[in-house]
From Swiss-Prot:
Belongs to the RbfA family. The gene is rbfA. One of its GO terms (biological process) is maturation of SSU-rRNA. This is Ribosome-binding factor A. It is found in: Cytoplasm. One of several proteins that assist in the late maturation steps of the functional core of the 30S ribosomal subunit. Associates with free 30S ribosomal subunits (but not with 30S subunits that are part of 70S ribosomes or polysomes). Required for efficient processing of 16S rRNA. May interact with the 5'-terminal helix region of 16S rRNA. InterPro entries: KH_dom-like_a/b, RbfA, RbfA_dom_sf, Ribosome-bd_factorA_CS. Residues 117-138 are annotated as: Disordered. It comes from Pseudomonas syringae pv. syringae (strain B728a). Monomer. Binds 30S ribosomal subunits, but not 50S ribosomal subunits or 70S ribosomes. GO terms for cellular component: cytosol.
């Protein structure tokens, strides 16, 4: 029977929970906004972890890049704090990356909504012109 949930996935999930709390509690830099950890991808040898995150309220590329720079510079501190919280022989090196899937998903959702609205307008136009007026005679 194959394992459905690998060790690296379990480590990644625990790291996601712990990092979310640590960043909120320990990182006091004003350049870091409301960070949401969306995923953690741990390498098979548990030597490296890619942390995918989004930042609420920061839409410009400069602000996002600044937040990632701050988090990557605090990666050693966060790794040390993770070592205290997690029971691992060695804690992976942390590499923060911006998760563009949320922005891409919102953009695709807006495109779909616009297409549905335009399709609805096209459907209403010819249908109302072809409709026969109802008679009120009884």
């Amino acid at each position: 029977m194959a394992k459905e949930y690998s060790r690296t996935q379990r480590i990644g999930d625990q790291m996601q929970r712990e990092l979310a709390q640590l960043i909120r509690r320990e990182i006091k830099d004003p350049r870091v906004g409301l960070v949401t950890i969306t995923a953690v991808d741990v390498s098979r040898d548990v030597g490296h972890a890619k942390i995918f995150m989004t930042v609420m309220g920061q839409d410009s590329a400069e602000e996002i890049a600044q937040t990632i720079k701050v988090l990557n510079s605090a990666a050693g501190f966060l790794r040390m704090q993770l070592a205290r919280e997690m029971k691992l022989r060695s804690v992976p090196q942390l590499h923060f990356h911006y998760d563009e899937s949320v922005v891409r998903g919102a953009h695709l959702s807006a495109l779909i909504e616009r297409a549905v609205a335009e399709d609805g307008q096209h459907q209403e136009g010819p249908a109302s012109a072809d409709a026969k007026p109802e008679s009120t005679e009884e």
